[in-house]
UniProtKB/Swiss-Prot annotation:
<feature type="modified residue" description="Phosphoserine">
    <location>
        <position position="125"/>
    </location>
</feature>
<dbReference type="GO" id="GO:0033882">
    <property type="term" value="F:choloyl-CoA hydrolase activity"/>
</dbReference>
<feature type="modified residue" description="N6-succinyllysine">
    <location>
        <position position="346"/>
    </location>
</feature>
<dbReference type="InterPro" id="IPR014940">
    <property type="entry name" value="BAAT_C"/>
</dbReference>
<keyword id="KW-0012">Acyltransferase</keyword>
<dbReference type="GO" id="GO:0052817">
    <property type="term" value="F:very long-chain fatty acyl-CoA hydrolase activity"/>
</dbReference>
<dbReference type="GO" id="GO:0006637">
    <property type="term" value="P:acyl-CoA metabolic process"/>
</dbReference>
<dbReference type="GO" id="GO:0005829">
    <property type="term" value="C:cytosol"/>
</dbReference>
<feature type="active site" description="Charge relay system">
    <location>
        <position position="362"/>
    </location>
</feature>
<keyword id="KW-0378">Hydrolase</keyword>
<dbReference type="GO" id="GO:0047963">
    <property type="term" value="F:glycine N-choloyltransferase activity"/>
</dbReference>
<dbReference type="GO" id="GO:0002152">
    <property type="term" value="P:bile acid conjugation"/>
</dbReference>
<keyword id="KW-0963">Cytoplasm</keyword>
<feature type="modified residue" description="N6-succinyllysine">
    <location>
        <position position="350"/>
    </location>
</feature>
<dbReference type="GO" id="GO:0008206">
    <property type="term" value="P:bile acid metabolic process"/>
</dbReference>
<protein>
    <recommendedName>
        <fullName>Bile acid-CoA:amino acid N-acyltransferase</fullName>
        <ecNumber>2.3.1.65</ecNumber>
        <ecNumber>3.1.2.27</ecNumber>
        <ecNumber>3.1.2.2</ecNumber>
    </recommendedName>
</protein>
<dbReference type="GO" id="GO:0052689">
    <property type="term" value="F:carboxylic ester hydrolase activity"/>
</dbReference>
Length: 420
């Protein structure tokens, strides 16, 4: 009798799961299926086919998928290959504190396209819980002065290294990365800056004094370890993160995921100084064969390494980690990161690290998150292409998440060895 097992059954979303099937016939082919519904009831699903060993066992840590949504040895393939039933869907966890994702795993007889797969019951099934927050993490709603967001504190007395988490063009408040980072020991402020609560509904300008207030708010908290903080940022959030690192002396470590090294849309303003946006050329906005918009060719002015529009990154005192998806269809992130690095090197700076991933797209998220190659952006335009190939994108997410944490710890925690 077939038996499906998964260890652990309940874990954080960035933790791997060991899946096995035992009790099969020797060399039997079995179909493994995974599915979940998000908080709006949207279905995401994946499947892969495996052949049992001579003793009737399948172990995803060692055995290759023969077909389905991925091929080869990929222990977590059922998770990162999940696809939305509705086109242009993106898996985003909104309520991180009160409920996990429930992922249903089934071991089934293989089927052919013309068969009715409902007729055959599964050989075995189970349900996994995938949490975005560890036990003991506290969430504090933030509405202080102008600041809007959510502060996540790890369990314990602290103090903990502080990080500000910034997302991009979707607006609103995204909490899933901040809650997960707090689960790994960082006091993390998910900071909203437009299209949320009483904040502006459109990003007409980037007021850096607002973000400075966010930094000061975080550093005032008794459980936050000063004197500096880190930034974790993506897309327009990374544009703002870079601007903060240049202008705010408290920024010690900045993670820039697929961001520009210039102002892309709305001007940045700080104490009267204005950083104007780069002129974009609409001729280079491409609608691909699937009807998805690709923006990555639009900022041709920045191709010149001495472009007057580039941020003066050499003025920053902290360290940078550039995370680049080389198949990004929203920004030419590889070019922009290399341009910023060249600017640092020209000024004798060595305060940077580059992680560049072939085949990875724009939305590099925590490990095992399904690749979103395209999604709707109703506030901007109907649909955007984010790029990325499933397997290399998954590998980039797993590797970069570990490196991001190492980078933040390296530059935000005191060097105890120097005190010995």
């Amino acid at each position: 009798m077939a038996k499906l097992t998964a260890v652990p059954l309940s874990a954080l979303v960035d933790e791997p799961v060991h899946i096995q099937v035992t009790g099969l016939a020797p060399f039997q082919v079995v179909c493994l299926q995974a599915s979940l519904k998000d908080e709006k009831g949207n279905l995401f699903s994946s499947q892969a086919f495996y052949r049992a060993s001579e003793v009737g066992e399948v172990d995803l840590e060692h055995d290759p998928s023969l077909g389905g949504d991925y091929m080869g040895v990929h222990p977590m393939g059922l998770f990162w290959s999940l696809k939305p039933e509705k086109l242009l869907g993106r898996l985003i966890k909104r309520d991180v504190m009160n409920s996990p994702y429930q992922i249903h795993i089934k071991a089934c007889h293989p089927y052919f396209p013309l068969q009715d797969i409902v007729v055959s019951p599964p050989l075995d099934s189970l349900t996994l819980e995938r949490w975005y927050v560890a036990p003991g993490v506290k969430r504090i709603q933030v509405k202080e002065s102008r600041i809007r967001g959510a502060l996540f504190l790890p369990p314990g007395e602290g103090p903990f290294p502080g990080v500000i988490d910034l997302f991009g063009g979707a607006g609103g408040l995204m909490e899933f990365r901040a809650s997960l980072l707090a689960s790994r020991g960082f006091a993390t402020l998910a900071l909203a800056y437009w299209n949320y609560d009483d904040l502006p509904s459109r990003l007409e300008k980037v007021d850096l004094e607002y973000f400075e207030e966010g930094v000061e708010f975080l550093l005032r908290h008794p459980k936050v370890l000063g004197p500096g903080v880190g930034i974790l940022s993506v897309c327009i959030g990374a544009e703002i993160g870079l601007s903060m690192a240049i202008n705010l002396k408290q920024i010690r470590a900045t993670v820039l995921i697929n961001g520009p090294n210039f102002v892309s849309q709305s001007p940045h303003v700080y104490h009267g100084q204005v950083y104007p946006p780069v002129p974009s050329n609409e001729e280079f906005v491409v609608t691909n064969a699937l009807g998805l918009v690709e923006f990555y060719r639009t900022f041709q002015e920045t191709a010149d390494k001495d472009s007057k529009y580039c941020f003066p990154i050499e003025k920053a005192h902290g360290h940078f980690l550039f995370v680049v998806g080389e198949d990004d269809k929203n920004l030419n992130s590889k070019v922009h990161a290399n341009q910023a690095i060249a600017q640092l090197m020209k000024n004798g700076k060595k305060n940077w690290t580059l992680l560049s991933y072939p085949g990875a797209g724009h939305l590099i998220e925590p490990p095992y998150t399904p690749l979103c190659q395209a999604s709707r952006m109703p506030i901007l335009i109907p649909s955007l292409s984010w790029g990325g190939e499933v397997i290399p994108h998954a590998a980039a997410q797993e590797h970069s998440w570990k490196e991001i944490q190492k980078f933040l710890k390296q530059h935000l925690l005191p060097d105890l060895s120097s005190q010995l």
